Amino acid sequence: MSKPAIYVINARERDRIPHENVPVAAIHAPMGAREMANPKYRKDWGYSFGNEIGRLAQGMPGRVKGTDTLKFISYADMPMDRRRDCTYARIVCNCRPQKSEVNRTRVTVGGNLINCPFDCGTPTTDLITVKILINSVISTPHAKWMTIDIKNMYFMSEMKNAEYMRFPIDLIPPEIMEQYKLQDKIHNGFVFCKIKRGMYGLPQAGLIAQELLAKRLGEHGYYQSKRTPGF
């Protein structure tokens, strides 16, 4: 039996391909903020983007619960010595037909502009260690294996030093503007936020989340090997 054809569809191609001709196995290539601002897609993707901002901030009533990862502030509330470090928001949109929320928007931090004053390398288990563990499981009669995906672990990791990020005002959905009263916070075409917890793209986010995980597991008798990082 032959495998189904797979189409890679980006925002520009989507209107040219009849929906009935696209197989279930279709993969939708991510599109960026510029394409999201296109009037053709703004309504659908604006709603998705609103959910993502609400998830990162203090929520959107009736839609998503916030994680208090970031907080919108006025430009004047940003410390003078941190304004040079203010980075950009990278916005990525993707279609995930297998998910309950098909149109998915994610915001990551422009980490290349972050000045981290400490070594933010994260201890990581190497591939050989993982292979040894898996081989041990499959070689042991009646052994069972379990993996756990921790939701919002990055977003729940407090940072000692806050970071700052900006959003172009023309991409912010109207309901977000109203909910967070952003009209009064516009400065030179941007709104600004204070990042209080870990976010994808922050160079220190992985280390902070790993340290928090080690602390939580330590309360139940688990500890990290001194010879094998991440184990």
Describe every region a protein language model picked out.
Residues 1-231:
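Chromodomain-type histone methyl-lysine reader module
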